[in-house]
């Protein structure tokens, strides 16, 4: 098992230019004997390197892709389109593994780009199903409103500072 620094050295960031000119940065390990590719989608802070232990474990058997939620994609729909473009560029059909907000992104990508998706693994997220009951819908809307409140508060902290603080706090717990 490695630490984050050796992980980052082993699996360096790559960049792809998407149609329309946006650049998309990601980490990708192509396992030559893999039968499937896994895309790891982190939660709301969008720090994929927090999944580095998962990435390494999956890389033993699968090809693995992960990326942060880059600021040029301002809505979940834009990010989902960018993910689909990335997968088109890599010519990959994938399993999406989404945690929290990553689960929402996974569902959006799967809904609008099913031709690229082999399956979903969702954790600690909500359902985007149409047949959701009123109680579940009310709870989801309450969570969204709570996130909006936190987002307004967090906008006072510059995103690079916030991300470093979150990474530091999480990595402290994994030592």
Task: Give the positions of each predicted feature.
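N-terminal cap/lid segment of alpha/beta-hydrolase-fold proteins
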Residues: 2-23
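Conserved HGGG/HGGXW glycine-rich cap/lid loop of the alpha/beta-hydrolase fold
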Residues: 18-73
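Active-site signature of alpha/beta-hydrolase-fold catalytic machinery across serine-
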Residues: 53, 108-112
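Conserved acidic catalytic loop of the alpha/beta-hydrolase fold
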Residues: 77-94
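Short beta-strand immediately N-terminal to the catalytic nucleophile in serine-hydrolase-like folds
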Residues: 96-98, 123
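Gly/Ala-rich beta-loop-alpha elbow adjacent to hydrolase catalytic centers
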Residues: 98-102, 106
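Flexible "cap/lid" loop of the alpha/beta hydrolase fold
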Residues: 111, 119-150
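Conserved alpha/beta-hydrolase catalytic His-Asp/Glu region
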Residues: 131-133, 149-175
């Amino acid at each position: 098992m490695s630490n984050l620094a050796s992980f980052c050295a082993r699996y360096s960031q790559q960049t792809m230019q998407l149609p329309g000119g946006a650049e998309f940065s990601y980490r990708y390990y192509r396992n030559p004997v893999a039968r499937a590719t896994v895309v790891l989608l982190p939660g709301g802070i969008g720090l994929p390197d927090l999944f580095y232990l998962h990435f390494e474990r999956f890389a033993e058997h699968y090809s693995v892709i992960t990326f942060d939620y880059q600021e040029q994609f301002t809505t979940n729909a834009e990010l989902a389109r960018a993910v689909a473009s990335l997968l088109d560029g890599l010519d990959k059909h994938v399993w999406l593994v989404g945690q929290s907000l990553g689960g929402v992104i996974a569902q959006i990508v799967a809904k609008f780009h099913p031709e690229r998706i082999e399956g979903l693994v969702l954790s600690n997220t909500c359902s985007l199903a149409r047949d959701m009951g009123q109680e579940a819908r009310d709870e989801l809307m309450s969570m969204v409103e709570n996130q909006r409140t936190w987002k307004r508060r967090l906008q006072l902290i510059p995103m690079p500072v916030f991300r470093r603080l979150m990474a530091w706090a999480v990595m402290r717990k994994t030592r």
